[in-house]
UniProtKB/Swiss-Prot annotation:
GO terms for biological process: mRNA catabolic process. The lineage of its organism: Bacteria, Pseudomonadati, Pseudomonadota, Gammaproteobacteria, Pasteurellales. It holds the Pfam family S1. This is Exoribonuclease 2. Residues 189-531 form the RNB domain.
Amino acid sequence: MFQDNPLLAQLKQQIHDSKEQVEGVVKSTDKAYGFLECDKKTYFIAPPSMKKVMHGDKIKATIEKQGDKEQAEPESLIEPMLTRFIAKVRFNKDKKLQVLVDHPNINQPIGAQQAKSVKEELQEGDWVVANLKTHPLRDDRFFYATINQFICRAEDELAPWWVTLARHEQSRYPVRGAEPYEMLDQKTRENLTALHFVTIDSESTMDMDDALYIEPIAQNSTQTGWKLVVAIADPTAYIALDSQIEQEAKQRCFTNYLPGFNIPMLPRELSDELCSLIANETRPALVCYIETDLAGNITAKPNFVSAYVQSKAKLAYNKVSDYLEQADNAWQPEMPEIAQQIHWLHQFTKARIQWRKTHSLFFKEKPDYTFVLAENGKVQEIKAEYRRIANQIVEEAMIIANICAAQFLHEQAKTGIFNTHSGFDKKFLENAHNFLMANLANEQNQTELAERYSVENLATLNGYCQMRHDIEPIESDYLELRLRRYLTFAEFKSELAPHFGLGLEGYATWTSPIRKYSDMVNHRLIKAVLAKQPYEKPQNDVLARLQEARRQNRLVERDIADWLYCRYLADKVASNAEFEAEVQDVMRAGLRVQLLENGASLFIPAATLHNNKEEIQLNPDELALYIKGDRTYKIGDIVKVKLTEVKEATRSIVGEILQ
């Protein structure tokens, strides 16, 4: 009798409308219940209600009150956690197809169907890409997904690569070529094949895009400086602006350097053969002449030319470094001309390093961690590799060449793709000032430092560099790591702007056009200026894509590395191996540390640091943990740790600090 009673329906609606409504994000637990995290409060979600939602869903909920207890009742979906996602295939006891989401906080199986476009016969554990089709809060149906793409079999040793690339929607294949290739750039080129250019790179490198030649500048038989000639491969000589290769390069933006192999931005026959500055092969190049005095100051405007060059030798970083460091049984140059080039480049590099330490910024050296892999992708070892003198020779030549390109593009083209960094985020300038004063000021220098580290001064390139030079000699990384959190991100811009991170007025890369799309764009601009041809300012969508691609590539590299670290360290738990580590982050939940030996990232739960969580306080300004009122751990601290758990399924490594 009450079934269709409009008064009753109205009453129910009024009761519902009178209840408090909130918006928040669902957080699951390892139990059946969960929580709704709102701006100022967290609400309990009971197990039956958790079946309607998923960890990470943004939802609307009503608050049900029973006595003094409150709990959230999910009402509607604002934004689902899952749309496109990575998953593993499973079959339930009735042999029904399901997927398990590859996410540490989502463990409920989701029913699934296989799209017709997926031809593989799916097996338990296969990796796939799926899309969520129905959601209980949105569609009044249970969770259901469609499998749209097969990635690889469960037992595929290269799963870390294929799964990660699929997650970030990146291709595992090089760009398809367009043979035969024709030289489109028919304008006259200078013939510089007689100059004794050399390339210095890793032994395994195929895509060599730079070669160097140097000679002293003398007046009245006395050396007064250096003439450095930087030759850069010229792929735009073969790639038309309206070609498919150009469009693909514009989308990829970078060659993706992954543990074990790379995925080139250009077709391999261009990057590794036709454009690569292979020894004793004549290649088209864009060349820059740079003159400096003996102290490394640039003394003339850079001179760019289109040319043909011929590298006379491919040299390996480690061999050149061994030779210059006079290591036992070191490699020796095959020809006196090569030895002469190495020694001159070495002298030039020492001058430029000193110039940068004085006039710009030079970073404390940190190692690169390299995975040594077997054919099947198994990690054999992880090496911490420091930049040696041969690496610095190439680095200094590229940096000065990029400084010159920024100057040339700014003056001649009035545009380009410039690498910029504006230092401290404006909203954190006050924090940076306060932090520096708290850590460096005393009674004697208080007034001087208040001016030196004023907000106005820190916002300028000179003031920022001055501050960096002040903290450079300090042994600990604490100041550097803490200040880093106040910085903005580096940006690509189409007009000249400073690069605070390098301490330079302008910086525009053009030295890796085989590997970076921004460098291809700058090549085209430089060549257009030289040929007096029209050109266009780089579009904002190109700059935005470069920014996004750089971010994606870093995530891909990090995700693969995290997976490989888990595989490598899994059997080290039982042996109780001890490692030195640097504290990288400090949170209420614990510490994030990096093993110095191999670069792996570990989580140290706060519960293992002290048995009474009420006595642990986080100081977010200092990025430090206080235990019983004493500052016990801060970022930059070196601690001794051991591994306690490695979970490959969630790519997480847990450890504890050894007291």
